[in-house]
Amino acid sequence: MGTAIHNNEDITIPQKNDGIKGVGIYHKGCLDGTAAAAVLLKKFPDVLLRPLSHRYKEEDLNNIVEETDNEAIVYIVDFSLREGHSEKLIEKVKEVVNIDHHIGSEEKLKILDKNYSNFSFVFNNERSGASLTWTYFFGEKDIPQLVKYIEDSDIWRFTYGDDTRYAVSYLYQFSGHPEKMLDYVNASEEEIEKILMDGKMIKEYRDGQRDVLLRDVSPINLKIKEHVVPVHNTPEFLRSDVGHVLATQLGKTVATFVINGDTVKLHFRGNDEHDPSALELAKILNGGGHRNAAAASVTLGEFFEMVEK
């Protein structure tokens, strides 16, 4: 953990009615990032939320910087900016708090914390972004069950077994919509039961789609340095479903990929016994994540160069 103080009355509340604009930057296209943003909304109903993906363009960040002033407090949750980019905000706004759990971010955050008095951070690779954000503002005691399910899936533990799978299958439809996710943050036990029932049906349908993809689409091999990695063309919403089944079937770390314009997003998945790990492969391509679930992006040209001939 960095120098940020959580669950403390000294936290400045960045609401419009006290003249301070609060800005929240969160991980785009990610269920955990969306839940972290929903937690921000719960704490600060007037916060200005701005999503960024790991492939963000510098102009996207510049637009956010333009929206701030020297009284703004910026919370970056389940995400960290690229090297040299955080300074754009830190040097303009009143305060920046960065809450993240992606392994490639820790050293950058430590350096920023050392160099800037108005920057603080929370980092823990064993937790998820939403869980860390909740703990920062509200403490460990009353973490909502749905946040626990999201964390359980995001760091690929599945302590709650199928309940985790059912919950995230249902909640995935709200990814990218923190204002809708907020409705579920403090769901009652009865509401959670209904979510799990509906999520079970969705999960069964997803499993069928996964099986069709694995049956009808064969992986190709990528050469990543000295490693030959099977990669499967899989829609984003099924990346973990397909990735982990394929990794288990092939007995090695694999990746799924999607092509978006000139960018190819690779999601690496593996198991504890696999070497190299998902994280090690992602880091070769300047990506990051967790040991068994990590991601990186390459250009379309770089991707074709890596395809094993």
Label every PLM stretch briefly.
Residues 161-219:
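Active-site-proximal loop/helix segment associated with metal-binding centers of metalloenzymes
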